[in-house]
């Protein structure tokens, strides 16, 4: 991706969405274009028009943290957008300023045992939306994603390439928008992650829905929320989710799902857990039978 174009488009789209009244500019209502003028952003940020024009052209080299924070306040950026602006500035700096990303690695047995010990649905994905681990009920919950040949175990591919995703996720539009915003956040954090860039290129090439959302330059921290799922075995589920980081493995994120106590979703989730346990027990019995026969 063209880093300068990323910076320029991000700042321009943030500037265009702000009305003069939101920025405290009164009395000037005749505008040919939406949003603030560059000179208004510069004045509110406390920098020269020339300096801001350079920044909006995509040149963040040497821009101080103080200026970035002031610019974030002027543009009314939220936490995710402010972090994204700092990530873009970090990527523009010398190599020593960039945070190293860990090399790809296998999911440790110790973490898999931890995941398996959790009673609620849990799955772990990386920055490229690949599912790298899950417990039995987590695999049962996301079976349509994991088993879909178009997805290849990747939630972004499932959403944008598989027609089944629109049934599985009743709130498909929100899910699609969230995935794109999360991918753009990760792209800002890891601009030289080739696998991530390749995935984004694949999605942009094959999906109009992805391209439209990618052009919006929205970013998001995917931490907590509500997920509605229409599961083929147990029906409709309304689940709260929480995302957790692995400090020793910053490329992975664990998601746990729970239902409100006494709700229909809790009952259906309990049924899904029973079905997952029966499937796991059956698989073990089959494996034990094969071992006995081989012996």
Regions found by a protein language model. Give the residues of each.
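Amphipathic, well-packed alpha-helical segments that form the structural scaffold of globular domains
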Residues: 12-19, 86, 90, 116, ...
């Amino acid at each position: 991706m063209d880093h300068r174009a990323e910076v320029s488009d991000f700042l321009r789209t943030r500037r265009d969405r702000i009305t003069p009244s939101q920025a405290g500019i009164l009395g000037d209502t005749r505008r040919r274009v939406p949003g603030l003028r560059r000179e208004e952003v510069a004045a509110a940020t406390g920098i020269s028009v020339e300096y801001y024009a350079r920044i909006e052209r995509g040149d963040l080299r040497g821009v101080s943290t103080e200026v970035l924070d002031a610019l974030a306040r002027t543009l009314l950026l939220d936490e995710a957008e402010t972090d994204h602006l700092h990530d873009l500035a970090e990527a523009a700096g010398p190599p020593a300023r960039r945070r190293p990303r860990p090399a790809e690695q296998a999911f440790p047995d110790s973490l898999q045992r931890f995941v398996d010990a959790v009673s609620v649905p849990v799955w772990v994905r990386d920055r490229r939306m690949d599912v790298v681990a899950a417990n039995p009920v987590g695999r049962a919950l996301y079976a349509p994603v994991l088993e879909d040949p178009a997805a290849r175990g990747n939630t972004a591919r499932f959403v944008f390439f598989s027609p089944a995703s629109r049934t599985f996720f009743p709130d498909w539009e929100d899910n699609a928008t969230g995935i794109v915003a999360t991918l753009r956040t990760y792209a800002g954090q890891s601009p030289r992650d080739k696998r991530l860039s390749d995935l984004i290129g694949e999605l942009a090439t094959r999906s109009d829905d992805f391209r439209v959302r990618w052009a919006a330059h929205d970013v998001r921290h995917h931490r907590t929320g509500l997920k509605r799922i229409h599961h083929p075995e147990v029906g409709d589920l309304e689940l709260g989710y929480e995302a957790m980081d692995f400090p020793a493995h910053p490329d992975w994120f664990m998601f746990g799902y729970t239902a409100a106590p006494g709700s229909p979703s809790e009952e259906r989730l309990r049924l899904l857990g029973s079905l997952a346990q029966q499937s796991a027990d059956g698989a073990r019995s089959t494996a034990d039978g094969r071992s006995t026969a081989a012996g």
